[in-house]
């Protein structure tokens, strides 16, 4: 006791220092674990966001292949290439029989009758045959361009729709999380952390309900919004084809069906056609494809009525209105025009690689992805048209699990991925 009394101040000071050190260390540890937990939650949230984004793109790819035949079948029917070819062949047969007769006889008298039989074809018949060749040229080229553009617009619009919905559902889940936190604090409960909810699958559940049983996705609204893809599949592609046909007429009508083209000449004609489709009024100002992708406002309820599973009245409510307005804003943006242009360009690149075979192209060198075409090679236009006609089948075929080289290449366009990421991460949109 005497020792304690003599050193009371020192002992108290030592105890105070020890207690302060303990409290300080405990505070530092708590702060450390708090920061560590926050970083872990943020990392988990980013990983879940990335997973949801990637899953969204895979869902879009599947949807594209599921819808492809619904879009390309009427396009193929609009352009009866095989029917025109059959009519041309039927007009060749009499001439072929005359030529066969000419080659099988040595009589000069018989030989003199051949021009008489040949000239028996009326001027009207010759004009009809010429017109058929013009029709075959326009129809074959218009079909190829319409299919490439239809594929590109289907990819663009499906990605846009599903990323808008995916982002909206993600933001709704975050709002629901914040609400859970506020309710937990008000009742004196400890609200689950962001990381806990992520681990529980709160942000990974795409079925439409949270782990707390609250609906965070409105399936009826989603279905109404997705119904607007009907417009491209049934109406939009028609105006798209008309836009393509006008460009094809302006570029290709001066080209004779009997012309011989080099690969560079063909590439230049293809490029001019794309330019007129994308920029029909001003080369420096591309037109958007809003009228091909979304209906005018006065026809929106008509589009909603096309959904047989929706028994409710076809009314565009406030939330759906905001979704459609945002979709239109994205379509009219300069970034969207660039993405669609790049999608079409990538599809036409595959198309040109296939046509290069007609020019006797050799396989690409190891340092170049493109086939090697002799600059002096010339090919008659009918041979080029025949190859174009074969490519249409590859552009049009598609269903989940079936490969389509054109769709695969377009889906890999970097500008499309970047645009999808911008859409998915635009969290400032009002819910």
Swiss-Prot record:
Polar residues bias spans? 112-121
Q: Which domain of life is it from?
A: Eukaryota
Q: What topology does the record note for this protein and the membrane?
A: Single-pass membrane protein
Q: Name one GO cellular component term.
A: peroxisomal membrane
Where in or outside the cell is it found? Peroxisome membrane
Per UniProt, what is one GO molecular function of this protein?
protein-macromolecule adaptor activity
Q: Report the sequence similarity comment from the record.
A: Belongs to the peroxin-3 family.
Protein name according to UniProt: Peroxisomal biogenesis factor 3
The segments annotated as topological domain Cytoplasmic are 29-431
Which keywords are on file for this protein? Membrane, Peroxisome, Peroxisome biogenesis, Transmembrane, Transmembrane helix
Region Disordered, residue ranges: 95-126
Q: Which residues lie on this side of the membrane: Peroxisomal?
A: 1-10
Which gene is the coding source of this polypeptide chain?
Answer: PEX3
What cystine linkages occur within this chain? none
The biological processes this protein is annotated with in GO are: protein import into peroxisome membrane
Annotated function: Involved in peroxisome biosynthesis. Seems to directly or indirectly sequesters components of the peroxisome biogenesis machinery.
């Amino acid at each position: 006791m005497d020792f304690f009394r003599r050193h009371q101040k020192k002992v108290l000071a030592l105890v105070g220092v020890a207690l302060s050190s303990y409290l300080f260390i405990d505070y530092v540890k708590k702060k450390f674990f708090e920061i560590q937990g926050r970083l872990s939650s943020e990392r988990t949230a980013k990983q879940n966001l990335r997973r949801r984004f990637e899953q969204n793109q895979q869902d879009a790819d599947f949807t594209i292949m599921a819808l492809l035949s619904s879009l390309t079948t009427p396009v193929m029917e609009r352009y009866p290439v095989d029917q025109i070819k059959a009519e041309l062949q039927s007009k060749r047969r009499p001439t072929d029989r005359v030529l066969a007769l000419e080659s099988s006889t040595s009589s000069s008298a018989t030989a003199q009758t051949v021009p008489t039989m040949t000239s028996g074809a009326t001027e009207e018949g010759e004009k009809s045959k010429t017109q058929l060749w013009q029709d075959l040229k326009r129809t074959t080229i218009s079909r190829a361009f319409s299919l490439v553009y239809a594929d590109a617009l289907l990819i663009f619009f499906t990605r846009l729709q599903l990323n808008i919905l995916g982002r909206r559902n993600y933001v709704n889940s975050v709002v629901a999380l914040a609400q859970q936190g506020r309710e937990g604090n008000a009742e004196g409960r400890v609200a689950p952390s962001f990381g806990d909810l992520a681990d529980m699958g709160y942000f990974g559940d795409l079925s439409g309900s949270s782990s707390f049983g609250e609906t965070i996705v409105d399936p009826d609204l989603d279905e109404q919004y997705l119904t607007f893809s009907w417009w491209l599949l049934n109406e939009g592609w028609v105006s798209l084809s008309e836009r393509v046909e006008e460009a094809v007429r302006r570029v290709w009508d001066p080209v004779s069906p009997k012309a011989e083209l080099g690969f560079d000449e063909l590439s230049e004609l293809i490029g001019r056609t794309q330019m007129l489709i994308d920029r029909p009024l001003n080369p420096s100002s591309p037109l958007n494809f809003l009228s091909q992708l979304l209906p005018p406002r006065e026809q929106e309820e008509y589009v909603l009525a096309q959904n047989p599973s929706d028994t409710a009245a076809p009314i565009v409510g406030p939330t759906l209105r905001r979704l459609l307005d945002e979709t239109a804003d994205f379509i009219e943006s300069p970034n969207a025009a660039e993405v669609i242009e790049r999608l079409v360009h990538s599809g036409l690149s595959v198309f040109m690689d296939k046509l290069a075979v007609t020019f006797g192209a050799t396989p690409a060198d190891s340092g170049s992805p493109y086939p090697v075409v002799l600059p002096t090679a010339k090919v008659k236009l009918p041979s080029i048209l025949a190859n174009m006609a074969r490519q249409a089948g590859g552009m049009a075929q598609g269903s989940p699990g079936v490969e389509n080289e054109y769709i695969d290449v377009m889906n890999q366009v970097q500008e499309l991925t970047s645009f999808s990421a911008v859409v998915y991460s635009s969290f400032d949109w009002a819910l």
